[in-house]
Amino acid sequence: MSLVKRSVAEFIGTFWLVLGGCGAAVLAAAFPNLGIGFAGVSLAFGLTLLTMAFAIGHISGCHINPAVSIGLWAAKRFPATELLPYIAAQVLGGIAGAGVLYLIAGGKAGFSLSGGFASNGYGLHSPGGYTLLACLVCEVVMTFMFLMIILGSTDRRAPKGFAPIAIGLSLTLIHLISIPVTNTSVNPARSTGPALFVGDWAIAELWLFWLAPIVGAALAGLFYHAFLDEPGEETEGTPASAQLRTEA
């Protein structure tokens, strides 16, 4: 599969992640009387990843997250030469998803970006008022565990066909844990899209939601490769290295 086609798949996947996950947060979380709340938003993010893993996993690997691509590279499962195209596609997809969400949300009288538009933040902009340090630790650890689950469930020794389920459920669990802390990022592209529309504080605090997920993902990739991989496991550049294996 050509790099262009795989990058297009990453764009579409990240678009859906932001529209579906952040859309649930913005449009449905606090809907009068019937709002889905934190649990519903958590499930929405997990479902967007689960559905896209089956839809594009065989095309691009369904990274739809710069931290995932970097973590796979650190684990020697993804070539460095393809990092920039993948990350660019993911960021653009996240921005496009946030743009469509903005158009939809703006169709309701009284809509305002002052509610945060599902942006990530710390301190005063943390949903629960958590400190910068707490938010940093949370994002690093959550992304580390996310990558450990991705790497383990896509390992050639793992049961075939179950990786998308494990990964989707892990993202749901991560959101259940960390929405009150940072509004949950673990994905720089997911954070960038909404932040560009909110501007101001969301842009000023965006650095954390690039730094922490990348650090957590890279540490997980290095750890898994050093301590849990077996000789003969996938190496950089092998065709299967980027894929979430979904075959039975």
UniProtKB/Swiss-Prot annotation:
Free-text comment on this protein's domains from its UniProt entry: Aquaporins contain two tandem repeats each containing three membrane-spanning domains and a pore-forming loop with the signature motif Asn-Pro-Ala (NPA).
Site feature location: Selectivity filter: 45, 175, 184, 190
Marked site positions, Involved in tetramerization or stability of the tetramer: 22
Segments traversing the membrane: 11-31, 36-56, 87-107, 132-152, 161-181, 203-223
Gene field: aqpZ
SUPFAM superfamilies attached to this UniProt entry: Aquaporin-like
An example Gene Ontology CC term for this record: plasma membrane
Alphabetically ordered keywords of this record: Cell inner membrane, Cell membrane, Membrane, Repeat, Transmembrane, Transmembrane helix, Transport
GO MF annotation terms: water channel activity
Annotated InterPro entries: Aquaporin-like, Aquaporin_transptr, Aquaporin_Z, MIP, MIP_CS
Keyword check for Transmembrane: yes
Source domain of life: Bacteria
Span(s) of short sequence motif NPA 2: 187-189
Subunit record text: Homotetramer.
Membrane topology value: Multi-pass membrane protein
Protein name per Swiss-Prot or TrEMBL: Aquaporin Z
Organism: Gloeobacter violaceus (strain ATCC 29082 / PCC 7421)
Entry function: Channel that permits osmotically driven movement of water in both directions. It is involved in the osmoregulation and in the maintenance of cell turgor during volume expansion in rapidly growing cells. It mediates rapid entry or exit of water in response to abrupt changes in osmolarity.
Intracellular or extracellular location(s): Cell inner membrane
Catalytic activities: H2O(in) = H2O(out)
GO biological process: water transport
Family recorded in the similarity comment: Belongs to the MIP/aquaporin (TC 1.A.8) family.
Placement of sequence motif NPA 1: 65-67
